[in-house]
């Protein structure tokens, strides 16, 4: 298992080849099994396959990303991104067969009353990690995309006020012949301390 997951890489070039919805649904079922604060499961996974919605998301994301690359990002951040040859153009948001938009549910709404959710950020982060692992296990590629600010996702996907975008995952098979930057993960000695 370790060997397989050490080969996982983010992909920005997807094949338009259809992906069975069942693979996506099973990955989300797995993500939904993640632990959460007080078992409140404060997440929503919105699966987008409609071409028009994907177009709207791409256009809105590119507006924010262009602003980020041209005005918001500090030079050192742009320099850190250079090995990945990324910029504000996000064609993959339309090419990937699916977009999974992960929302964090900051509080519950029951009979018009707010119900506090605990450890929302941590819980949604864990569930998203489960989701990425399940997608990889299913033979699918993905990329964590956070076009900040992300409020346009709430509007386009018609989500309620208590749900906030956490991140966006384009999902599909990698394009044939796609290459990814040669990167290394830190060795165990750098990430683990045993006392």
Where are these regions (language model features)?
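Short acidic N-proximal helix/loop "leader" segments that mark the beginning
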Residues: 1-18, 22-29
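C-terminal helix-cap and adjacent tail motif
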Residues: 3-11, 167-195
């Amino acid at each position: 298992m370790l060997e397989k997951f050490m080969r996982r890489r983010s992909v920005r070039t997807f094949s338009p080849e259809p992906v069975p919805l069942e693979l996506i649904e099973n990955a989300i079922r797995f993500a939904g099994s993640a632990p959460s604060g007080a078992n409140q499961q404060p997440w929503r996974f919105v699966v987008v396959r409609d071409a028009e919605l994907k177009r709207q998301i791409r256009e809105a994301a590119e507006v924010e990303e262009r602003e980020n690359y041209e005005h918001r990002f500090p030079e050192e951040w742009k320099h850190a991104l250079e090995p990945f040859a990324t910029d504000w153009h996000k064609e993959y948001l339309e090419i990937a067969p699916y977009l999974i938009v992960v929302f964090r549910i900051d509080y519950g709404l029951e009979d018009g009353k707010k119900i506090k959710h605990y450890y929302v950020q941590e819980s949604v982060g864990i569930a998203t990690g489960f989701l990425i692992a399940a997608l990889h296990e299913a033979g699918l590629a993905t990329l964590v995309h956070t076009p900040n600010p992300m409020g346009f996702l709430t509007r386009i996907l018609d989500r309620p006020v208590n749900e906030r975008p956490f991140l966006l995952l384009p999902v599909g098979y990698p394009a044939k012949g796609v290459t990814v930057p040669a990167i290394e993960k830190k060795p165990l000695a750098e990430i683990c301390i045993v006392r």
